[in-house]
Amino acid sequence: MASVVLLPNADVSNDWTLSTGSDVYALLDDQVSTLGADSSYLSSTSAGSACVVELQDFSEAHSRINSVTLVTVSGNGARAASHVLETRLGSAGGDYYTESSGVIPAHRTDYVTKTYTTRTTTDGSTAWAEATLNSLRVRVDLDAHTSGTTQFTYLAVTVDYDEPVATDNSILFGTNF
């Protein structure tokens, strides 16, 4: 098995506050461990903020796509503050999965990485296909927010896949293997 990480590469919509620039996707593609050291993130001071991004295309040679796993990194440094992200993995045609991060507690200085449920199908029975992966969108809502400023800095989908079986028709010492 092999894996590849698909990062955001296009904006669809957004109402979070951007720390810099004008592209949401560009603020969600790097991992930083501490809130204070980060200069590339989305932020919000109230529940209801949402963004939708498209992901990079899956272009790996493969024989089978086994699963996808969504990861987000966010944090809120305010004392006793917490937040909840709601994620929707889908396409322009609708959502495949909606999942809550659960309560992410304040961590004063560090971001918190949340790994969501690994999904082996798009709908409970249909296997992932390259075309499906190449049209993926992720929506992230700040579903709950107690105080302070929530920062959202990273989003990725890890695709686990089988590489194609190599066929080797080498002739060694006059014998075809």
Feature roles, as predicted:
Residues 29-47:
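Short carbohydrate-recognition loop motifs
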Residues 43-61:
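Short beta-strands within extracellular/lumenal beta-sheet-rich domains
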Residues 80-93:
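Short, surface-exposed beta-strand/strand-loop-strand elements in extracellular ectodomains
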Residues 139-148:
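Short beta-strand-plus-loop segments that form exposed binding edges in beta-rich domains
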Residues 95-127:
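Extracellular carbohydrate recognition and processing domains
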Residues 62-77, 138, 157:
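A short beta-strand element within beta-rich, extracytoplasmic domains
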Residues 1-26, 156-177:
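Enriched but not universal
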Residues 64, 122-135:
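Short glycine/proline/serine/threonine-rich loop/turn segments at secondary-structure transition edges
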